[in-house]
């Protein structure tokens, strides 16, 4: 790797975050711990990572010309995408011109579109997945649902945090599911994926790091989803040695195919010793927030080390830990958090994200906890999150 310069000096090593949410905020903090100069970009002002960055910009990152102009002006050494709504074709062009995109522009483009990553996993790598079809019209959507059968799931090919996702149980659900998926889409893609139901015992996120010293795995993270978005996560998730080995093999094949240095959040379904591929993100994963207390190197620290070309070595896991989200339904531009003394019980921590607006349901923070067992840690995290009083 190249030497790291000093932030705000002529030879500074600059990192530009495309997306400045709570995950980007932690990447910014870890970057600054290594002396990097951080530039945060998002579509709204005062986003969480902007509050800790050296400087920030507000723009629509789907506008390729504007994105290119900003990057050429700031001249970052590393471009680090955190969200899906980005002009990925521009990133491909910039990378061909010599810019470094994390982990690489191809990985960002493929994974920000469910069609790209699903075809890579199922058709190129021949990994087990749920049955699926893609549709770009209501007629094609109806046909896809008929072929997959009920129950099935509809998702925009580009979305985040569960937006636009729904379950279909009968013909009455088809039209509303199509409309909901189209409304929840991000970026320029209009297609919808229809997925068949997968019966599983549990689902995991296997944080997988591709670095200068090889591929590394964090302990598997279990999580509970509701309405397509994570509500709590825990590490480690107990699973059989055979299932863990299969999960690691699948994750390794996916990240090798995507390429580049960085951390990948590989989502998998587990049924006994069987493992089925679900999705992958080429960046820190929201369920991985638990690693802020569960590991000596959080997923954010691992991501930064990896894309800088630094070795990872051994990742130490501290035992049963859990996270539970703070997810109020409010309308406010000036939220306050109360009862924190009660929330911060022994063996717990809080992260309040500092989001400047809430207009409905929005994740504003996370409670973190550890314990003698997974269930103890989960209960502590849930109790801590429930104790926080959030007022508009």
Swiss-Prot record:
Record field: catalytic activity: N(1)-(5-phospho-beta-D-ribosyl)glycinamide + formate + ATP = N(2)-formyl-N(1)-(5-phospho-beta-D-ribosyl)glycinamide + ADP + phosphate + H(+)
Positions bound to Mg(2+): 267, 279
Residues binding ATP, per UniProt: 114, 155, 160-165, 195-198, 203
GO biological process terms held by the UniProt record: 'de novo' IMP biosynthetic process
Annotated residues for binding of N(1)-(5-phospho-beta-D-ribosyl)glycinamide: 22-23, 82, 286, 355, 362-363
Domain of life of the organism encoding this protein: Bacteria
Keywords: ATP-binding, Ligase, Magnesium, Metal-binding, Nucleotide-binding, Purine biosynthesis
Pathways involved: Purine metabolism; IMP biosynthesis via de novo pathway; N(2)-formyl-N(1)-(5-phospho-D-ribosyl)glycinamide from N(1)-(5-phospho-D-ribosyl)glycinamide (formate route): step 1/1
Keyword Hydrolase: no
InterPro entries with a match to the protein in the record: ATP-grasp (IPR011761), ATP-grasp_carboxylate-amine (IPR003135), ATP_grasp_subdomain_1 (IPR013815), PreATP-grasp_dom_sf (IPR016185), PurT (IPR005862), PurT/PurK_preATP-grasp (IPR054350), PurT_C (IPR048740), Rudment_hybrid_motif (IPR011054)
Disulfide bonds listed in the record: none
Domain called ATP-grasp: residue spans: 119-308
One term of GO molecular function: magnesium ion binding
EC number: 6.3.1.21
Alphabetical list of Pfam families matching this protein: ATP-grasp, PurT_C, RS_preATP-grasp-like
Recorded GO CC terms: cytosol
Family that this chain belongs to: Belongs to the PurK/PurT family.
Self-association and partners: Homodimer.
HAMAP family assigned: PurT
Function recorded in the entry: Involved in the de novo purine biosynthesis. Catalyzes the transfer of formate to 5-phospho-ribosyl-glycinamide (GAR), producing 5-phospho-ribosyl-N-formylglycinamide (FGAR). Formate is provided by PurU via hydrolysis of 10-formyl-tetrahydrofolate.
Record-given protein name: Formate-dependent phosphoribosylglycinamide formyltransferase
Protein species of origin: Edwardsiella ictaluri (strain 93-146)
